[in-house]
Design a protein with these regions (language model features):
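Catalytic machinery of carbohydrate-active enzymes
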Residues: 1-305
Length: 305
């Protein structure tokens, strides 16, 4: 059986679609699955089972990238096509059965997938390999708490100020020096955030894995105690690794994109989403200031204890 799954360009949406992939892997364990996803998200499938091919969609002008994918997939008669992008591509490919995701509003993205496709899409899953887990375990010490911290994001208005992250981590360290902060994000985010977030914190309490692959980051998440970060793909990755997750929200919709899972928590700005929707947001400015250091600290202490 040959299955084609057309995923999102975005890391977060692709992580949220891993429940779809899990469903087909479980239902058809002998199937050969081809993935189409964006270049940043494609590495999420590095360790997935049932893989036949992985195609990276690198955007081109006038949507010409779809022609590249078309010519790579047109000669195959697919048993199942799952189109999570509602693209035209799936209408031009031979198939026996087709699932096309149709977005809804006001419910979580996972529930949208489940309702639209007609099966349970909630079993988020990221596969890590033995080497990745060995590397993570080597730095995870049993006598310490380990907090994954993601201070970045792809949109400045939803990023909590780095100075507040630093103050919050200092406060945590002062209350319990048996804690290690695992800093995650891209190599570019390392340049932007590493110095300021780690100021006045002993280097032995910092584990810097900025720039590591998504699956290596996931391996660290699987052996850690808690995640704190902005609304982001790495926040969804944390949920997929079954790590307790606290996420900070302001001008984005936590009802749709909040951390999936019963034990996970959203800390919102004092302003609600309607407030932000009425504003002409400055793309170079954070709108997360009304979330206080103490507010985040108290929630972290509650979860870590």
């Amino acid at each position: 059986m040959k299955i084609l799954i057309i995923c999102s360009n975005l890391v977060g949406d692709t992580v949220l679609s891993t429940g779809v992939i899990s469903y087909f892997q479980k239902k058809y364990p002998e199937s050969l699955i081809t993935f189409i996803a964006g270049p940043k998200a494609i590495s999420l499938f590095n360790n997935s089972t049932n893989i036949d091919q992985i195609h990276s969609v690198k955007k081109k002008k006038f949507n010409l990238h779809w022609f590249d994918i078309y010519f790579k997939t047109i000669k195959i008669k697919w048993d199942i096509i799952v189109d999570l992008r509602s693209s035209l591509l799936s209408y031009f490919l031979a198939n026996k059965k087709k699932y096309i995701f149709k977005k809804k509003t006001n419910i979580h993205h996972i529930l949208q997938l489940t309702q639209s496709l007609g099966f349970d899409c909630s079993n988020l899953k990221i596969d890590t390999n033995e080497l990745e887990e060995k590397i993570a375990k080597k730095q995870i010490k049993s006598d310490f708490k380990h907090l994954i911290v993601f201070p970045g994001g792809n949109w400045e208005p939803k990023i909590w100020p780095i100075e507040k992250y630093n103050k919050m981590l200092i406060k945590l360290y002062q209350s319990n020096n048996k804690i290690k902060f695992i800093l995650v994000g891209s190599a570019e985010e390392k340049k932007d955030y590493l110095f300021n977030i780690s100021k006045n914190i002993p280097s032995e309490n910092i584990i810097d894995i900025f720039g590591e692959s998504l699956t290596q980051t996931a391996a660290y998440m699987k052996f850690s105690d808690l995640f704190i970060g902005n609304d982001s793909g790495l926040m969804h990755l944390s949920c997929a690794c079954n790590l307790k997750t606290i996420s900070l929200f302001g001008p984005t919709d936590d009802k749709i994109y909040g951390p999936w899972g019963k034990e996970n928590i959203v800390i919102r700005t004092k302003e609600n989403l309607d407030h932000f929707n009425k504003l002409n947001l400055d793309e170079k400015k954070s709108y997360m200031d009304t979330i206080t250091v103490d507010q985040v600290y108290q929630m972290l202490i509650k979860f870590l204890n």
